Amino acid sequence: LPLTYALAHGAAQGLDILRATPAQLNGRLEARNLDVSGVSSITYARHADDLLILPDVCIASDGDVRSVLLVSRVPAENIGARRVLLSDKSASSHALLKIILRRAYDAVPQYETRALTPEDPVPEGAAGALFIGDDALELYHHPPEGIYIYDLAREWKQMTGARMVFGIWAAARTFAAAHPAELEM
């Protein structure tokens, strides 16, 4: 990404760069083990009193994103109350999937968060699974036979007419108050 490239090549002088999954970054910022981080939009919403959004930078999609997918053994309209697995690497995508399944497909599945692999995308006993990142891209470009694939950004756009904001950059309000010059970009 242009932002991470810029940070790695000089824009982050004097800063420590941590590479981690979105869920790990969310947890570290919530625990105040990070001062500034990319954070899921749902985590920001849950902790808005403690975090400050950094303007002009986000992870969003105005259509297909290909890296946030529901992979299912059955059409989404047939998921109902069946079991759906959630990637342990995400937070916003969990909330997004739950909203889409409930509102667009009248489904209220049993959810279980766990590690998932594209080699066995929908394990026995599950109707579907939520994938993000490289694993989702692999499944998008090489879909297994007999599997339905739903791009959640496209589903959101069709349902709401709005783009989906998956993540934003945020700073702990205490850090922002103590170091305002360091947040100028």
What positions do the PLM features span?
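Bilobed "Venus flytrap"/periplasmic-binding protein-like clamshell domains
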Residues: 1-9, 19-20, 66-126, 134
